[in-house]
Design a protein with these regions (language model features):
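Alpha-helical interaction elements in eukaryotic regulators
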Residues: 7, 31-38, 230, 244, ...
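Short amphipathic alpha-helical segments embedded in low-complexity Lys/Glu-rich regions
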Residues: 2-6, 26-28, 141-142, 266
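Thioredoxin-like thiol-disulfide oxidoreductase module
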Residues: 2-20, 44
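Non-catalytic, surface beta->alpha helical segment in thiol-disulfide oxidoreductase systems
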Residues: 27-47
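Noncatalytic linker/hinge segments flanking ATPase motor cores
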Residues: 13, 37-44, 179-184
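Non-heme di-metal
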Residues: 48-298
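Short coil/turn linker and secondary-structure boundary residues
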Residues: 3-6, 33, 259, 290
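Short, structured active-site "lid" loops
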Residues: 13-33
Length: 298
């Protein structure tokens, strides 16, 4: 992001009408326009989204806060093969129908939502954000999300024997209304016609609000000594998602053009209400001995 050496008025004075014939500028495939439109774009654009030649090399590190999170993610690598679910099957047989319903909905939500998160990073954020440190982190997060999705799919495949039910759970973002509502909200706010800052905040809400109730519920199973494979995977994934949330917040703090306070409140309020509805209605806490009011407060 380099200051232009020739101001608009000076250029007009030097070149007159010919200034309008300057080559048309495109950035990331988007037509910006002529020289004057390009100047206006630079004045209004978010600096971290502006392409620079620095993005092609890792060093020198300019944003130590982002780099530290990338290195932390790098050190926490794991694979789906590390999760042993063999002992879970005996516990699964002993669970009540309500408890099984509870776990099925959690796994179904996670299996689909990780795909939405993956697509948003891969198709949007990783391409838009030009900071080397952020691009490094997103490369690792894409890997994380694939491992998470594989793990949740593996758990569904292991626990559920009926092929029709299994198919319904794998397609939960279109077949199960409470999960569909969460997916639709995420895709609404991830739409790349929206300002980057709004999309980044909504992304943080998915990782920090939409996931939190389900993580908490699985930790409740661990407290009861049930489903060790599921609980171990939950520890690994919740740790990863906590780091992803920290990164989104750190990046958001660096933005020069943040959403209005009203928009911020709207995004967070919607996310909280949807998650409260999901955790109380789709996952009826009271049916398995959890306190729905306390979960809602959480």
């Amino acid at each position: 992001y380099t200051k232009l050496l020739v101001e608009k008025d000076e250029l007009k004075e030097r070149c007159g009408p010919r200034a309008a014939t300057y080559p048309q500028v495109k950035i990331n495939g988007e037509l910006i326009g002529d020289y004057f439109a390009f100047q206006e774009y630079l004045e209004e654009a978010e600096p971290m989204l502006l392409p620079t030649m620095n993005r092609f090399t890792v060093f020198p590190i300019e944003h130590e806060n982002l780099w530290a999170l990338y290195k932390k993610a790098q050190m926490s690598n794991w694979t789906a093969e590390e999760v042993d679910v063999s002992a879970d099957m005996e516990d699964w047989k002993s669970l009540t129908d309500n408890e099984k319903h509870f776990i099925k909905y959690i796994l179904a939500f996670f299996a689909g939502s990780d795909g939405i998160v993956f697509e948003n990073i891969n198709n949007n954020f990783a391409d838009e954000v030009q900071l080397t440190e952020a691009r490094s982190f997103y490369a690792y997060q894409v890997h994380n999300e694939m491992v998470h999705g594989e793990t949740y799919s593996k758990l569904i495949d292991k626990y559920i024997r009926d092929s029709a039910e299994k198919k319904k759970l794998f397609e939960a973002i279109t077949t199960i209304d409470p999960i569909k509502k969460k997916a639709e909200w995420a895709m609404k706010w991830f739409d790349n016609s929206r300002p980057f800052a709004e999309r980044l905040l909504a992304f943080a809400c998915v990782e920090g609000i939409f996931f939190s109730g389900s993580f908490c519920a699985i930790f409740w199973l661990k407290k009861r000594g049930l489903m060790p494979g599921l609980c171990f995977s939950n520890e690994l994934i919740s740790r990863d998602e906590g780091l992803h949330l920290d990164f989104a917040i750190e990046l958001f703090k660096m933005l020069q053009n943040k959403p209005s306070q009203d928009t911020i409140h709207e995004i967070v309020r919607e996310a909280v209400e949807i998650e409260k509805g999901f955790i109380i209605e789709a996952l009826p806490c009271s049916l398995i001995g959890m306190n729905a009011e306390k979960m809602s407060d959480y």
